[in-house]
């Protein structure tokens, strides 16, 4: 470049001034020649930064070179210094300007990345909503077709999944729709009706009915001695073991809208009610005996206060007919796969035996839900063995004066939730018996001397 060459000439001129051709007198005020320093300074001041063709082209380099060469010859030190300072200031300003532009570009790139993430999350959310809407629309179409077939007294036929999906993918007018979602009759013209997938109670022949009744009788006889020999667990309500799913399915009937509304109202999670308390209440309220198909379950609406749980419950796979509790349990394990993921409330002490039994059954319930699929021999929360985590949690929520007794009770090897609940209930039974000390309130902190609560009678 010409600029380094000018600097090299300037250094050589400093050490060998005799090489200069011009003298300082040549640039005297009386001369009419134009001062190259002033001419170059004017060009620099009027040049636009950094888009000017003058500042970015060969014209600037040549002007700088000739100006430095002139000052080297006339030995004008001040002019050379001012020129260098002017160029240094110009380069510094350009550098600061470019640095600001780069910073703005980086901020813009970060904003675009953040917008991309937000847009991706929004798209996923809308995609999930669309899937839920398609699922609900499919269920409504099947149910409407079932109602129309009953009104028009048409024979029962199997629902065609392809026709239902085709209706969802295009505009659908329920007023003009002819209700054709059934599979086509085979070429032989067989009039034997097949069951639609949404019907709950199939019509059985006399032979199959006789076989089913015989199977029920054998099942009841086999279950009778087991129920009698099992330990009776005393809870707030009597515990009734559910029948087999096949028996409950055969007894399934179509619920009316009033029944579904009442069922949803009684099993909906209450305000400030923890999820573990709510799921145990559904179990105790007969949720394990209330048989529903998927359409009836979806008709109940959101039952939990957790929005993510409700979304999962609306998209559970259709596995036929099952109990209300099983529908909720299937969504539960997807929302909270382990007991650690279920956020527990602040530790609260329980002040009565009934509350302690209820609290222990809640711990057993959430433990059972997480291992329900791998432990089919456990038929309820009462069959769950006391684990170390359950023991620590339960003892931590116990009053300080009761901890030693409760801890020693829970340390028995292989003891279950039902066994502990039964032993705690024995304290209530003992407190009901009259003694010389008199009767005490059931489950209160003032019980007989046989229990570790005796010193709390005055509290």
Curated annotation (Swiss-Prot):
Biased composition (Basic and acidic residues): 213-223
Domain of life the protein comes from: Eukaryota
Region (Disordered) residue spans: 192-269
A GO cellular component annotation in the UniProt record: Golgi apparatus
InterPro entries: Fv1_restriction_factor
PANTHER family per the UniProt record, alphabetical: FRIEND VIRUS SUSCEPTIBILITY PROTEIN 1
Stated role: Retroviral restriction factor that prevents infection by gammaretroviruses. Acts by interacting with the capsid protein ca after entry of the virus into the cell. This interaction presumably disrupt the capsid thereby inactivating the viral genome, making it unable to enter host nucleus and integrate into host genome.
Protein name (Swiss-Prot/TrEMBL): Friend virus susceptibility protein 1
Taxonomic path: Eukaryota, Metazoa, Chordata, Craniata, Vertebrata
Gene behind the chain: Fv1
């Amino acid at each position: 470049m010409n600029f380094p060459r000018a600097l090299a000439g300037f250094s050589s001129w400093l050490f060998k001034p005799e090489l200069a051709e011009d003298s300082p007198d040549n640039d005297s005020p009386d001369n009419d020649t134009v001062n190259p320093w002033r001419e170059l300074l004017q060009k620099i001041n009027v040049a636009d930064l950094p888009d000017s063709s003058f500042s970015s082209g060969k014209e600037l380099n040549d002007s700088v070179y000739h100006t430095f060469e002139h000052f080297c010859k006339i030995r004008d030190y001040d002019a050379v210094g001012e020129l260098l300072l002017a160029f240094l200031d110009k380069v510094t300003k350009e550098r600061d300007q470019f640095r600001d532009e780069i910073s703005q570009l980086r901020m813009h790139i970060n904003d675009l990345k953040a917008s991309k993430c937000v847009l991706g999350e929004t798209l996923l959310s809308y995609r999930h909503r669309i899937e839920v809407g398609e699922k609900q629309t499919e269920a409504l179409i099947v149910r409407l077709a079932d109602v129309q077939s009953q009104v028009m007294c048409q024979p029962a036929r199997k629902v065609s999944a392809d026709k239902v999906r085709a209706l969802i993918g295009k505009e659908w007018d329920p007023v003009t729709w002819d209700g054709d979602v059934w599979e086509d009759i085979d070429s032989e013209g067989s009039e034997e009706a097949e069951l639609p997938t949404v019907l709950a109670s199939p019509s059985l022949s006399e032979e199959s009915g006789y076989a089913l009744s015989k199977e029920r009788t054998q099942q009841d006889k086999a279950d009778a001695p087991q129920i009698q020999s099992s330990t009776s667990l005393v809870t707030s309500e009597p515990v009734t073991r559910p029948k087999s799913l096949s028996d409950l399915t055969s007894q399934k009937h179509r619920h009316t809208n009033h029944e579904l509304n009442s069922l949803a109202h009684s099993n909906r999670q209450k305000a400030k009610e923890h999820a573990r308390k709510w799921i145990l209440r559904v179990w105790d309220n007969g949720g394990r005996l209330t048989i529903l198909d998927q359409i009836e379950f979806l008709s109940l609406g959101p039952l939990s206060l957790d929005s993510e749980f409700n979304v999962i419950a609306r998209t559970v796979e259709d596995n036929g007919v099952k109990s209300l509790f099983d529908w909720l349990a299937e969504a539960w394990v997807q929302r909270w796969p382990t007991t650690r993921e279920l956020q527990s409330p602040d530790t609260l002490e329980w002040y009565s035996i009934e509350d302690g039994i209820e609290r222990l059954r809640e711990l057993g319930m959430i433990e059972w839900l997480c291992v329900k699929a791998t432990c089919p021999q456990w038929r309820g929360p009462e069959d769950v063995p006391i684990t170390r985590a359950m023991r620590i949690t339960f003892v931590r929520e116990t009053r300080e004066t009761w901890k030693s007794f409760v801890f020693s009770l829970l340390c028995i090897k292989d003891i279950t939730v039902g066994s502990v609940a039964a032993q705690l209930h024995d304290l209530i039974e003992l407190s009901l018996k009259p003694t010389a000390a008199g009767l005490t309130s059931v489950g209160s902190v003032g019980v007989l001397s046989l229990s570790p609560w005796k010193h709390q009678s005055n509290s």
